[in-house]
Amino acid sequence: MTVDELKTKKIGVLMGGLSAEREVSLKSGAAVHQALLARGYDAVAIDVDRDIAQVLVREWVDVAFIALHGRYGEDGAIQGLLEIMGIPYTGSGVLASALAMNKIFAKQAFQAARLTVAPYKVFCRGDKAALAELEFSLPVVVKPSQEGSSVGVSIVKKESEFAAAMKEAFRYDREILVEQFIKGSEVQVGILEDKALGAIEIVPKNEFYDFDAKYSPGMAEHILPARLPAELYRKVLRAGEDAHRALGCSGYSRVDFLVTEEGACYILEVNTLPGMTDLSLLPEIARGSGIGFEDLVERILAAAALKISQ
């Protein structure tokens, strides 16, 4: 849709929601809402709850800007509802969202696309999980299959830490991913209109890029562009676009990598609804490409559509 067309529509900014990332989503949504108002759009902020279908009807929402993170927002659930209601929305469709949110299925898609992933093993609730079952050695990373923002993630360096890490991860999911720890630089690629904008390097103050480092000022250094040799920089941009396509993503995303000294690019995940807060990385990458926050929001909105063919 064109800007002129969109300015005749009622834009619902979907935010908050029911996931462990609710507070982050409220910040993303507030920033997006303010940007749309500043550009003259008829926009309403909607804190998503289980009555969201009735709210969308009551508010006469024509187009949805999804600023949700985590379950029910980033996993295909809200996308499916919007498809049924015939409300065009921003970001990826049902299948791509569900695949990206499930780290296990996403890894399988990445492997099929010949992208590099860390060795891993899946455990389900009720399994007798033991380090002896792994085909790789400590340290390892333990994470829930379907949470974002590093919720429930632990680095295990000693065998005595494994049980507690698994217990913590199982608080959030029935399936747990145990990955080989890869030593490398945290590099994240911003995708807009299905093309790589650039890559940013993250240097956390803590041992790894955890929830606090992502959302607390001063807890991580952001280096843009990432400090990589030119050919390796181009390689990680291509890998970001390949990962975005491998899951069938639409419009925009953020693709997270670990890049080793040897030049290997290990993909961690694709975020189909990346953060839009003051500390968020996609807006920072966009600024580095000359795209201000309001412009970024407007370009994301312009790509809003229904993804399931009629």
Curated annotation (Swiss-Prot):
Domain ATP-grasp: 107-302
Cofactor: Mg(2+); Mn(2+)
This enzyme's EC code(s): 6.3.2.4
Catalytic function, reaction form: 2 D-alanine + ATP = D-alanyl-D-alanine + ADP + phosphate + H(+)
Note on how the cofactor is bound: Binds 2 magnesium or manganese ions per subunit.
InterPro entries assigned: ATP-grasp, ATP_grasp_subdomain_1, D-Ala_lig_Van_CS, D_ala_D_ala, Dala_Dala_lig_C, Dala_Dala_lig_N, PreATP-grasp_dom_sf
UniProtKB keywords: ATP-binding, Cell shape, Cell wall biogenesis/degradation, Cytoplasm, Ligase, Magnesium, Manganese, Metal-binding, Nucleotide-binding, Peptidoglycan synthesis
Annotated binding of ATP, by residue: 135-188
GO biological process: cell wall organization; peptidoglycan biosynthetic process; regulation of cell shape
Localization in the cell: Cytoplasm
NCBIfam families in the record: D_ala_D_alaTIGR, PRK01372.1, PRK01966.1-4
Protein name (database record): D-alanine--D-alanine ligase
